[in-house]
Swiss-Prot record:
Pfam families named among the record's database cross-references: Pkinase
Annotated family: Belongs to the protein kinase superfamily. STE Ser/Thr protein kinase family. MAP kinase kinase subfamily.
Enzyme Commission identifier(s): 2.7.12.2
GO CC list: early endosome; focal adhesion; late endosome; mitochondrion
Catalytic residues, chain numbering: D191 (proton acceptor)
Organism whose genome encodes this protein: Cyprinus carpio
Reactions accelerated catalytically: L-seryl-[protein] + ATP = O-phospho-L-seryl-[protein] + ADP + H(+); L-threonyl-[protein] + ATP = O-phospho-L-threonyl-[protein] + ADP + H(+); L-tyrosyl-[protein] + ATP = O-phospho-L-tyrosyl-[protein] + ADP + H(+)
SUPFAM superfamilies recorded: Protein kinase-like (PK-like) (SSF56112)
Top-rank lineage group of the source organism: Eukaryota
Name of the protein described by the UniProt record: Dual specificity mitogen-activated protein kinase kinase 2
Residue positions where Phosphoserine is found in the record: S219, S223
Amino acid sequence: MAPKRRPVPLIIAPTGEGQSTNIDAASEANLEALQRKLGELDLDEQQRKRLEAFLTQKAQVGELKDEDFDPICELGAGNGGVVHKVRHKPSRLVMARKLIHLEIKPAIRNQIIRELQVLHECNSPYIVGFYGAFYSDGEISICMEHMDGGSLDQVLKEARRIPEEILGKVSIAVLRGLVYLREKHQIMHRDVKPSNILVNSRGEIKLCDFGVSGQLIDSMANSFVGTRSYMSPERLQGTHYSVQSDVWSMGLSLVELAIGRFPIPPPDAKELEAIFGRPVLDKGGAEGHSMSPRQRPPGRPVSGHGMDSRPAMAIFELLDYIVNEPPPKLPHGVFTTDFEEFVMKCLMKNPADRADLKMLMGHTFIKRAEVEEVDFAGWMCKTMGLPQPSTPTHSAE
């Protein structure tokens, strides 16, 4: 990891003239506690200023109510909910509002809202900012910082493949986000995938949709059938799983972003040549990529942006493949050996053999990516057709 910097004191600026605030002695104490917590984080000057700005804006928001939002557009759907870009009228802030429809008893609903309050304490440059959660008309609303670049699955659709040097920066942010959640809050993400990694025109990369509310996870499991394709083999088998499961999901996501399609079943030599524009050899010198000892299934992955024209693989075939077949890997000779090895360590089927967060943070691929000069914001804005720079909260419509 980067050398430790001296913690920079956090100053929350007072709210502007005419803004109503509810800052009493209790919330003053909360701000002091927040300053102490942020002081413990390894923030550079820019990260500190951005967190300060977000928290200053958040202090002006007050209690969130359904009637205070004007819809702007729909950002996407997934994880049992629809996400809208909205304007919060009292503060004029642009936010992302996720609506989750749940048929649940009031006691369960109140427990979910209570459990979501933990998100107020999740303040990190690698975690999407949280404004608050509330219940209205049969729906739970989770209001978050708006990330104007969208999610990495949306970026992938535009880019077709994401370059290794960009994925180096993504890997650093995801790892630091997972380390923060584990060390500061003792929680694991549980749902790492490209659609839960968000980016913005300032070049920030942040995790969202992690499992802070056990009750919400349970309620959604009863209501929705989500994609299970990023789950680790041990989790699919119903055995005990830990943060090592998040490591698997990150590795699988990186392969998808690097080759341009969900990597199960693996692309054959013909598809790899179509993807990379040249023959791709395996380590033995022969064309091809599949490590599977048995015949490759006839279906293609459930989702992806590749050139595979076979009928879709049924979800049960996909889950069987993840549990019983060799793990995906990066095609040899297209990427650096550091990146190949990093992904391989993430995708060991036995969680005991899989690299942990600390090992991955010290890996050569990450160490190289930390010192590499990469204009992530420039690449992102060019790919997504965004002006640069702009702020995620007051972004242009």
